[in-house]
Design a protein with these regions (language model features):
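Short, solvent-exposed, charged loop/turn and helix-capping segments
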Residues: 87, 93-118
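Second-shell loop/turn segments in exported
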Residues: 74-86, 105, 109, 154-157
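Extended amphipathic alpha-helical scaffold segments
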Residues: 49-60, 89-101, 130-134, 171-172
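Immediate post-signal-peptide N-terminus of mature secreted/exported proteins
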Residues: 18-84, 184-189
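Positively charged n-region of N-terminal signal peptides that target proteins for export
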Residues: 1-4
Length: 189
């Protein structure tokens, strides 16, 4: 009987000792939640920029755009707004990077930091290159837009979308692994 109790006690100790400690799980939960919230905030700003670009892409194709002064003014205002939205996105990403670095100071051992930083860097690169190129192209297009100009805008949009989708896929894979590794499902309850 003593041997059975000893074996059960040994098995119980081994199974609880194999997983991450309570402190590690708590830290992992904080890192996971913070990362998701920072990315959500960045994504909201990015969506505002993308919605403005989509609106412009529809409107610049209107055949009689030159005759409608109000529509021309709206387009001009929206094109000017693109730069402000892009600058806002860059600011939010840089602010998020700072917040992540502050969180990482004493918790650098967690793998999710790398994936989160990677998605931040991708957003910064897209905002600094692809979005700025879109903004510059929008300023110089003829109205209604020529097919060649529209094709360039589509290529830039597609490139930005592809880069972001790749970074998001990488983050999603890493965060799912992180979530499972630290048993964050039980913490969320």
């Amino acid at each position: 009987m003593r041997k059975i109790l000893f074996l059960l006690l040994l098995i119980a100790c081994c199974t609880t000792a194999c997983g991450p400690s309570k402190q590690n799980r708590k830290e992992a939960g904080e890192i996971y939640t913070t990362s998701l919230n920072l990315i959500k905030n960045i994504n909201q700003h990015d969506s505002i920029y993308v919605n403005c670009v989509q609106y412009l892409m529809r409107e610049i194709q209107t055949p009689s755009i030159q005759k409608n002064k109000k529509k021309l003014q709206n387009l001009s205002d929206s094109i000017a707004l693109l730069e402000n939205l892009n600058d806002s996105l860059i600011y939010i990403v840089e602010k998020s990077k700072t917040q992540l670095n502050d969180l990482q100071i004493d918790k650098s051992k967690y793998k999710l930091f790398k994936a989160t930083d990677s998605i931040f860097n991708t957003y910064l690169n897209v905002a600094n290159y692809e979005y700025k190129n879109i903004n510059e192209k929008m300023k110089t297009i003829s109205l209604p837009v020529k097919d060649s100009e529209y094709t360039i805008l589509l290529k830039l949009s597609f490139k930005a979308d592809s880069l972001l989708n790749s970074a998001i896929k990488y983050f999603n894979n890493e965060s799912a692994e992180f979530y499972e590794k630290y048993g964050l499902k039980e913490i969320a309850k």
